[in-house]
Amino acid sequence: MGRLVKQKGFDILLEAFRLCSDRHPQWSLYILGEGDERETLEAMAETLKLQERVKFLGLVKDPSLVLRDTDMFVMSSRFEGFPLALIEAMACGLPVISTDCPTGPSEIIRNGVDGILVPAEDAHALSAAMECLLADPEKRRRLATEAVNIVDRFGAEKVMMLWDQLRMQVVGIPQRLDVDKESIVLPGHRS
């Protein structure tokens, strides 16, 4: 799920899927999103003889409907900022696997607790993690149960509280922001 661009590493995901696909013919891979790499990725899936098992769904109005019908979420990015797709998947109660790329995933996933981190750009490690997770229903259930707690850690109310704490530390303004109002007014600024 994401923009189909080099940064997101969908080529790595396709290679990882190829590595384990022969042993698991019942598996399918769904890729959501659009981007400059779509044709290249579709050609790669065909070259890898995966075109029947890899589905490019394009932009999906409500990705949670697709996510709820899957067994896991895999993020194969080369680099990230703060990957909302990962948080969305966890909030849907999916066990997640992600590359431990610079910034992002390791700030979100507690490795082995609510998700699995593997080295970035390592299709073999990604494939092994996928096989491990699908072979162990209890581990999938445990990770999924913990994953939904992401809302407690990164929900809007929690994030606003953290921003408020940061603002107080940096600016030294003692008043708290009122997150229950429709708009936020900072002291000294009137709307």
For each feature predicted by the language model, list its residue ranges.
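Aromatic "clamp/platform" in nucleotide-sugar-dependent glycosyltransferases that forms part
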Residues: 59, 78
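Conserved acidic donor-binding segment of nucleotide-sugar-dependent glycosyltransferases
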Residues: 110-112, 116-123, 132-137
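A short, well-ordered alpha-helix in the C-terminal region of glycosyltransferases
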Residues: 46, 125, 132, 139-153, ...
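C-terminal alpha-helical cap of glycosyltransferases
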Residues: 156-190
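A conserved mid-protein helix/loop that constitutes part of the nucleotide-sugar donor-binding site
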Residues: 3-19, 29, 36-42, 124
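Short hydrophobic beta-strand element within catalytic cores of glycosyltransferases
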Residues: 95-99
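Short acidic/histidine- and often glycine-rich active-site loop of Leloir-type glycosyltransferases
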Residues: 88, 101-112, 116-117
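A short alpha->beta transition loop at the rim of the catalytic pocket in nucleotide-sugar-dependent
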Residues: 64, 71, 93
